[in-house]
Curated annotation (Swiss-Prot):
Reactions catalysed: AMP + diphosphate = 5-phospho-alpha-D-ribose 1-diphosphate + adenine
Classification via Gene3D superfamilies: 3.40.50.2020
Known function: Catalyzes a salvage reaction resulting in the formation of AMP, that is energically less costly than de novo synthesis.
Subunit structure: Homodimer.
Organism the protein comes from: Thermosipho africanus (strain TCF52B)
Entry's Gene Ontology molecular function annotations: adenine binding; adenine phosphoribosyltransferase activity; AMP binding
Name of the protein in question: Adenine phosphoribosyltransferase
Family: Belongs to the purine/pyrimidine phosphoribosyltransferase family.
This protein's encoding gene: apt
InterPro entries, per the entry: Ade_phspho_trans, PRibTrfase_dom, PRTase-like, UPRTase/APRTase
Keywords assigned: Cytoplasm, Glycosyltransferase, Purine salvage, Transferase
A Pfam family assignment: Pribosyltran
């Protein structure tokens, strides 16, 4: 199944000059969604790890499903003000602005092995910030996984030493 056919391009969203990769057609199609989860789980099952860390919102969809399928813990990473307990934070630059990520201070035990999952790898800024957040908490990032990688933005340039696993490369 060619999952690329389920990715819709939305020009000038959220800002002019940005092409948004809309995964809702993939999510809507039960066979495509299942295929994506199964393929990602197959790739990740070969790695020794304890937790999947994923940012809101679309990272939750895949990160939660993968955690369930692989019998691993799931750590949600949110925007400021969304978590009820004490947090650690990391600020970073996006393709179209600045942002901040937070997770509970006790989310990761020292030495736990983590896979970071997000729906799209664009510039690598979010992934880099997620890694810093995991390391602040005492975790070790053993891989970064993505549904879609936008190779034309050269995200691997800033993630040179990372084990990157992408399902769809555009």
């Amino acid at each position: 199944m060619d999952l690329r056919t389920f990715i819709r391009d939305i020009p000038d969203f959220p800002e002019k000059g940005i092409i948004f990769r809309d995964i809702t057609p993939l999510l809507k199609d039960k066979e495509a969604f299942k295929h994506a989860i199964d393929m990602l789980a197959e790739k990740l099952s070969e790695i020794d790890f304890d937790l999947i860390v994923a940012p809101e919102a679309r990272g939750f969809i895949f990160g939660g499903a993968l955690s369930y399928k692989l019998n691993k813990g799931f750590i949600p990473v949110r925007k400021p003000g969304k978590l009820p307990y004490e947090v650690i934070s990391e600020k970073y630059t996006l393709e179209y602005g600045e942002a901040e990520l937070q997770m509970h201070v006790d989310s990761i035990n020292k030495g736990q092995k983590v896979i970071i999952f997000d729906d799209v790898l664009a510039t690598g800024g979010t992934a880099k910030a997620l890694k810093k957040l995991v390391e602040k908490a005492g975790g070790e990032v053993v891989a970064m996984s993505f549904l879609i990688e936008l190779s034309y933005l050269n995200p691997r340039d800033i993630l040179k030493d990372e084990n990157i696993i992408s399902l769809i490369i555009l």
